[in-house]
């Protein structure tokens, strides 16, 4: 069995599920999952867990993500990105300056509330929102709180001859954030229709785009029996508090027994030497093995 984390550079035109399906065939390994869905048109970092690493991928999805993208002011779409049909057009504000855009972007920092787009996989009454959208049905969407730690403009405002304005941005955000909704809400705050016209995920769970591999690159390495693209399973628990255990505690964990450890953290990544061997969960005053990885 292959175990580890892959820093995959997902290319445009494929779903996150497509990427997993292709890797299963390529690596001849059924136990593969991804950490954090990317829309088909979005490129960038997609953490992939293989083998035992699938048991810790949930702890990677809790980590923050960094995106780089582009906002287009002047019209909105059904999907809130460039792939959708035009819903409405509007003229640009009489006064639209870089200073105004920058000031408005700062109002989205911290904890904010978003309404997920209709074309998303969020479930309402057991059905995904995009299923309602494709059927032409309306449904009340649950608002959710997300965290934005960085939201800044990274290019000058580009005014086009057809009355649009585009600019690039960078955003660092927490789990569950819809960046296309952020682009739409920014436009609304500026008093203009808008959508997200480009997006790439440049970092996720400590993995960066600079060190990511495409499916083609991975296929080429596998054909040469080169597996250096596979990161240790320990990358999957990098954001959890670490606790080094001794041989006696290792034996106790292997039998599923509770341990008394000097910590108050709700979850611990238990290490024996340099290897993660379990995820421990605090129960009363002791730690119970939640996931044993040996």
From Swiss-Prot:
**EC numbers for this chain:** 5.4.99.25
Q: Which UniProt keywords apply?
A: Isomerase, tRNA processing
Molecular function (GO) terms for this protein are: RNA binding; tRNA pseudouridine(55) synthase activity
Q: Where is the active site?
A: 39
Top-level taxonomic group = Bacteria
- EC class of this enzyme? isomerase
Does the keyword section mention Isomerase? Answer: yes
Q: Name one Pfam family in it.
A: TruB_C_2
Q: Which GO terms describe its biological process?
A: mRNA pseudouridine synthesis; tRNA pseudouridine synthesis
Reaction catalysed? uridine(55) in tRNA = pseudouridine(55) in tRNA
Query: NCBIfam families this protein is in?
Result: TruB
- PANTHER family (alphabetical): PSEUDOURIDYLATE SYNTHASE TRUB1, TRNA-PSEUDOURIDINE SYNTHASE
Similarity field: Belongs to the pseudouridine synthase TruB family. Type 1 subfamily.
What the protein does? Responsible for synthesis of pseudouridine from uracil-55 in the psi GC loop of transfer RNAs.
Q: What is the designated name of this protein?
A: tRNA pseudouridine synthase B
Classification from the root reads: Bacteria, Bacillati, Bacillota, Bacilli, Lactobacillales
Q: Which gene encodes it?
A: truB
């Amino acid at each position: 069995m292959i175990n580890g984390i892959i820093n995959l550079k997902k290319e445009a035109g494929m779903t996150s599920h497509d990427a997993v399906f292709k890797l299963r065939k390529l690596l001849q390994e059924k136990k593969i999952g991804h950490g954090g869905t990317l829309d088909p048109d979005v490129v960038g970092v997609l953490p992939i867990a293989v083998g035992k690493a699938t048991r810790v991928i949930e702890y990677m999805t809790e980590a923050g993500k960094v995106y780089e993208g582009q906002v287009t002011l002047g019209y909105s779409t059904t999907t809130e990105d460039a792939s959708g049909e035009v819903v409405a057009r509007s003229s640009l504000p009489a006064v639209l300056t870089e200073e105004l855009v920058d000031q408005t972007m700062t109002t989205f920092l911290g904890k904010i509330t978003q309404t997920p787009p209709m074309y998303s996989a969020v479930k309402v009454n057991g059905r995904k929102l995009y299923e309602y959208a494709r059927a032409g049905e309306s449904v009340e969407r649950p608002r959710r709180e997300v965290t934005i730690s960085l939201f800044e403009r990274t290019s000058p405002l580009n005014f086009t001859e057809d009355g649009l304005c585009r600019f690039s941005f960078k955003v660092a955000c927490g789990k569950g954030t819809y960046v296309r909704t952020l682009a739409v809400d920014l436009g609304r705050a500026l008093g203009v229709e808008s959508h997200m016209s480009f997006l790439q995920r440049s970092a996720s769970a400590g993995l960066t785009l600079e060190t990511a591999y495409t499916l083609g690159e991975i296929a080429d390495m596998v054909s040469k029996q080169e597996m250096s693209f596979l990161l240790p399973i320990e990358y999957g628990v990098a954001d959890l508090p670490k606790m080094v255990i001794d041989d006696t505690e290792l034996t106790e964990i292997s039998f599923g027994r509770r341990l008394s450890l000097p910590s108050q953290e709700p979850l611990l990544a238990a290490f024996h030497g340099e290897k993660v061997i379990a995820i421990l969960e605090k129960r009363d005053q002791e730690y119970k093995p939640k996931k044993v990885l040996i």
